[in-house]
Curated annotation (Swiss-Prot):
Domain (MABP) ranges: 9-151
Gene that this sequence comes from: MVB12A
Protein name: Multivesicular body subunit 12A
Tissue: Ubiquitously expressed except in skeletal muscle.
Keyword list, A-Z: Cytoplasm, Cytoskeleton, Endosome, Membrane, Nucleus, Phosphoprotein, Protein transport, SH3-binding, Transport
């Protein structure tokens, strides 16, 4: 019988035997009756009146891919070796307890991320009863044991907790401060820094005829010892006695007639005898 399509329920994480006179192990639920409604107590006899219930435990979380799930169930003869990869189902409170003298139940546990199919449910019935949609494993203790297999769900990655630094980078509007508040705090920080600067600092002196400095608007200043000579104030006093000359004044002052050159060029070269 092929596995049925996956269901919304979680796969089984384990099976265990529990004495009928005691509560099931923590995290397990007991199969107390068959599909027909008859009591489902194993091993009940004159020597052992309480008997045992088969208990199931479902996988609680899909976040851990290494969490084991029940991949298969088999019924084997008590004295025969267990199939490869299988382990016996036992009573957690009494590992030596014997449920059946002839047979024993064993399960194959695999990590959730390493199996394609898993067991999702187990039911008990009389030997002549058929349970639709379930695969018959075998007979034990006067009952027919059925299991329902389905496609194993894929592990769900566990969400990571964001640190405060990462939350600061989040685009979630609910966790971000308002734009107006952010601008106000930024302006406040820049204002407090700019208030420590003085207009007579060399970086704010006029470095051109327009009085605009490359440092205007920069919210920090260099330490004086890192300022070079090029940052010193410009001495405009050197231009105080500047005389503006006309074209005629320049031609008169720098007029040169080239008389010597012309005289030398006019001389005849000496004759060669």
């Amino acid at each position: 019988m092929d596995p049925v399509p996956g269901t919304d329920s979680a796969p089984l994480a384990g099976l265990a035997w529990s004495s009928a006179s005691a509560p099931p192990p923590r995290g397990f639920s007991a199969i107390s009756c068959t599909v027909e409604g008859a009591p489902a107590s194993f091993g009940k006899s004159f020597a052992q009146k309480s008997g045992y219930f088969l208990c199931l435990s479902s996988l609680g979380s899909l976040e851990n891919p290494q969490e084991n799930v029940v991949a298969d169930i088999q019924i084997v003869v008590d004295k025969s070796p267990l199939p490869l990869g299988f382990s016996p189902v036992c009573d957690p409170m009494d590992s030596k307890a014997s449920v059946s003298k002839k047979k024993r139940m064993c399960v194959k546990l695999l990590p959730l991320g390493a199996t394609d199919t898993a067991v999702f449910d187990v039911r008990l019935s009389g030997k002549t009863k058929t349970v639709p949609g379930y695969l018959r494993i075998g007979d034990m203790g006067g009952f027919a044991i059925w299991c329902k297999k389905a496609k194993a769900p894929r592990p769900v990655p566990k969400p990571r907790g964001l640190s405060r630094d990462m939350q600061g980078l989040s685009l979630d509007a609910a966790s971000q401060p308002s734009k107006g508040g952010l601008l106000e705090r930024t302006a406040s920080r820049l204002g407090s820094r700019a208030s420590t600067l003085r207009r007579n600092d060399s970086i704010y002196e006029a470095s051109s005829l327009y009085g605009i400095s490359a440092m205007d608007g920069v919210p920090f200043t260099l330490h004086p010892r890192f300022e070079g000579k090029s940052c010193s104030p410009l001495a405009f006093s050197a231009f105080g006695d500047l005389t503006i000359k006309s074209l005629a004044d320049i031609e008169e002052e720098y007029n040169y007639g080239f008389v010597v050159e012309k005289t030398a060029a006019a001389r005849l070269p000496p004759s060669v005898s």
